[in-house]
Amino acid sequence: MTDSHYLDRAREKLIVALDFWEVEDARKLVRKLGDEVSFYKVGLGLQLVGGNEFAKELIVEGKRVFLDYKYYDIEETVQRAVAQAAELKITFLTVHGVASIMKAAVAGRGNSDMKILGVTVLTSMDAEDIKEMGFDGKVEDLVIARAKKALEVGVDGVVASALEAAELRKQTSNKLMIVSPGIRPSGGARHDQKRVATPFEAIRAGADYLVLGRPIYAADDPKAAAQAIIQEMADALRPD
């Protein structure tokens, strides 16, 4: 395979998080990145300032959109909200990794092509954090339990740290898509992330998609930062 083959595959797997509070700031980053990035995450920061309309704008421009609103409400509300998101032609949508919520999301998705992702444990959390939530044991055990439930109720994948990706592959018979945030280039600052991996480590561990925000949008040259990350991902995809 040629280098361009692995670079193209890596580009498909990179999701850039638009963690802004104003749509215009997100729009400026998208312009800077140009054709280098085709997949963007729109989260809660943009939700109340036109996030849905901006998502439509991105889709019209040929971009894929990961709507990361992490729905968590009564089943009927989740089902209806997911149905509305499906009408936007969203690619990925997150809901909390609770069985009843995920089941409602699958029902709301209907026959659309939108993929539902169950959030397992945030990468900003560690064992101490889940202990405060009332869960004893390892973070990995909770992630695996929620992933198995996700598979059981019919969602398409999970959001999980790359640190758990390899074990997730084993425990779910490779049947769930794994989307991994908490990705930091070698030597990069962790910021608010506690369970992190490099792009190379994440791809080798079995993550299907990587979500990166600050390492790209806070860089002096966001496009060059994205290109470096894509190269590292491509290196991981290339057989030894």
Curated annotation (Swiss-Prot):
Active site as annotated: 70 (proton donor)
State where substrate binds: 19, 41, 68-77, 123, 184, 193, 213-214
Catalytic class of the enzyme: lyase
Keywords from the named record: Decarboxylase, Lyase, Pyrimidine biosynthesis
UniProt-listed Enzyme Commission number(s): 4.1.1.23
Q: Which InterPro entries match?
A: Aldolase_TIM, OMPdecase, OMPdecase_bac, OMPdeCOase_dom, RibuloseP-bd_barrel
Query: Which GO biological process entries does UniProt record here?
Result: 'de novo' pyrimidine nucleobase biosynthetic process; 'de novo' UMP biosynthetic process
List the SMART domains hit by this protein, alphabetically: OMPdecase
Pfam families in alphabetical order: OMPdecase (PF00215)
Which GO molecular-function terms appear in the entry? orotidine-5'-phosphate decarboxylase activity
Domain of life of the organism in this record?
Bacteria
What job does the chain carry out? Catalyzes the decarboxylation of orotidine 5'-monophosphate (OMP) to uridine 5'-monophosphate (UMP).
Q: Which family does it belong to?
A: Belongs to the OMP decarboxylase family. Type 1 subfamily.
UniProt cross-references to HAMAP family, sorted A to Z? OMPdecase_type1_B (MF_01200_B)
Quaternary structure, per UniProt, is: Homodimer.
The name on file for this protein is Orotidine 5'-phosphate decarboxylase
Organism encoding this protein: Nitrobacter hamburgensis (strain DSM 10229 / NCIMB 13809 / X14)
The gene name reads pyrF
